[in-house]
């Protein structure tokens, strides 16, 4: 079945864009271009920044009109201030291990976004990582040194992913001067239920998506989702 996170993020991005094709999009940490190419095909002007050369090669092979740059989310100095209506920060934040770098990436995203623009940031959540890795996969005993007393994952410099809790995200927004419009559980329970979801018929899966989209803003589901999408504007 389709990717629940992608379906959800597209729905909220389309709400933000509201069909206005004059709005410009910046996709920071664009990967192989899933979101960039989708909105390019819808007729939006999209600029993408990606760090990894292999990803850029795959992206370019998709033959889109996206303006693709190799670059780092921590330094977008090749892009002018206040030049994009909608800025996506879907990959970088959970690949940056320390708070200073996350803060720097958010500040760069904010700098290149227009005064009335919207910044959408994806985060990888702590509870999903602990439940799925430490307990479902039975790594808890050897993982104890990687967790604080209250079970927050300790991010180490050579880790691939950095996990956060909602209060961490609130702190980053406060530091970066971003004001939340809304926050969404992009995957909801889907990553826990993958085996069951994959066994659903197309009709049943459509009902699951309807359920998820009707509940993904509920506060009680946010922290347990594998990812959240934070939709913010400049203060």
What do these predicted ranges mean?
Residues 182-235:
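A C-terminal cap/extension of S-adenosyl-L-methionine-dependent methyltransferases
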